[in-house]
């Protein structure tokens, strides 16, 4: 059940079997927005089963909604020094930097990528921790107040702490991801 970016790599490395869609009659119900995608442009290797977004999880007790409404910039706000979490993976961290700077999420321009690396380095003094799954404990227990994370996971955390809220910076852009089913060749 790989994510979109890994499916593209697996196709490129000839690691997946082509699917026989005669054996997948319910594929007809897959929304057109999830067919002929950049990661599987000919719809040969994958069937999406879930999708999601990356947004900003924050604690309404401590974080000013006006700051969150500024979008990704809140993750650099010194007002929340040592209460900000950041992804511990380059894909999502660079994506946030790209959106913050107004760059295309798929940019390969070396100058733009260096600018992203630079603002991520500038962010380091205000970041409490670089995390993945640790975000659950840190946000639910109010050790941290702001974190970028996956919307579905944020909804689960919000059930555990009524002070948590989710913001999707639509004006700046956000990552949309797809996880799909595939059949490996081996």
Question: PLM features: what roles do these ranges have?
Answer:
Residues 1-2, 17-56, 83-85:
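A structural signal for short loop-to-beta-strand junctions that line the ligand-binding cleft
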Residues 4-6, 24, 60-62, 80, ...:
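Solvent-exposed coil/turn segments that connect beta secondary-structure elements
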Residues 6-7, 85-89, 93, 97, ...:
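Ligand-binding pocket segment of bilobal, Venus flytrap-like solute-binding proteins
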Residues 11-18, 40-44, 156-168:
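Ligand-binding "clamshell"
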Residues 55-62, 99-100, 177-186:
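A bilobed periplasmic-binding-protein/Venus flytrap-type ligand-binding module shared by bacterial periplasmic
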Residues 61-70, 102-109, 186:
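Short helix-loop capping/hinge motifs at secondary-structure junctions, enriched
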Residues 61-85:
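Hinge/capping helix and adjacent helix->loop/strand transition within the periplasmic-binding protein
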Residues 159-186:
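Extracytoplasmic/periplasmic substrate-recognition and gating elements
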